[in-house]
A protein has these predicted regions:
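Feature marking well-ordered beta-strand scaffolds used for ligand recognition
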Residues: 1-171
């Protein structure tokens, strides 16, 4: 399977035959700006997406995370549009061990507790560019939470790379 985040819509494709991919389903999100990246929960039941341009275009007022239910691949259902607390343009997110690690450009990395995958809750953040605010495309670009040590890498376009580790029992 291939899960495509294609700007204005979400597409699920069967790519068994690489020369002839078949569309299984296409779904659209309300007020889409530019949806381009997402990540599956470990059980593959939910797909989390960020929209990079919805805030810049004025479609929403804070960072929006889309949560799709993939129980029926022929009919994915948008079950939540989680709204963050900051007016941050979102870029990339990755899920690991019940948390979503989001690169939110000028507001750094935000961490969501997704132990209840249909109802995310903000759990923490690290601001890579405290001198920048508002929507825009500078600051935290991506995260990598997959080191066995628990260290999380956050890359920031102007500031470089940050290696972070949460405090014990912080969230």
């Amino acid at each position: 399977l291939c899960l495509n985040s294609n700007g204005a819509y979400f597409e699920i494709m069967d790519v068994t035959d690489k020369a002839n991919p078949q569309t299984i389903s296409t779904a659209s999100s309300p007020n889409a700006g530019y949806i381009h990246q997402g990540w599956l929960t470990d059980d593959h039941k939910y797909f989390y997406q960020d929209d990079e341009a919805d805030l810049v275009r004025g479609s929403v007022e804070t960072t929006r995370t889309l949560v799709w239910d993939l129980t029926d691949l022929e009919d994915p259902i948008l079950i939540n549009e989680f709204m963050g607390t900051m007016p941050a343009s979102a870029h990339n997110l990755y899920l690991k061990d019940g948390f979503a690690y989001q690169a939110n450009y000028r507001y750094g990395m935000h961490v969501l507790d997704i132990t209840d995958p249909e109802n995310p809750v903000e759990a923490g953040f690290f601001d890579t560019s405290p001198y920048l605010e508002g929507p825009g495309f500078s600051g935290a670009w991506s995260t990598y939470p997959f080191f066995e040590s628990g260290t999380v890498l956050v890359t920031s376009l102007q500031e470089g790379a940050f290696l972070l580790r949460k405090k014990k029992d912080a969230f």
